[in-house]
Amino acid sequence: MAVPKRRVSHSRAAKRRTHYKVTLPVPVKDKDGSWKMPHRINKTTGEY
């Protein structure tokens, strides 16, 4: 069974976690000129 040899320090774990960044979703302009999130149904036109 795989067991770590020693405990990972808080600073080392935080340094590893710096690479996991959250990206903000970018809204796109629809055919009718309204802004919507990509891959969502537009409430005004009903298009995907």
UniProtKB/Swiss-Prot annotation:
Span list, region Disordered: 28-48
GO molecular function: structural constituent of ribosome
SUPFAM superfamilies: Zn-binding ribosomal proteins (SSF57829)
InterPro entries, sorted: Ribosomal_bL32 (IPR002677), Ribosomal_bL32_bact (IPR044957), Ribosomal_zn-bd (IPR011332)
Pfam families: Ribosomal_L32p
Coiled coil, from the record: none
One cellular component term from this protein's GO annotations in UniProt: large ribosomal subunit
GO biological process per UniProt: translation
Key word Cytoplasm present: no
Keywords carried by this UniProt record: Ribonucleoprotein, Ribosomal protein
Family, similarity comment: Belongs to the bacterial ribosomal protein bL32 family.
Protein name: Large ribosomal subunit protein bL32
Source organism of this protein record: Campylobacter concisus (strain 13826)
Source lineage: Bacteria, Pseudomonadati, Campylobacterota, Epsilonproteobacteria, Campylobacterales
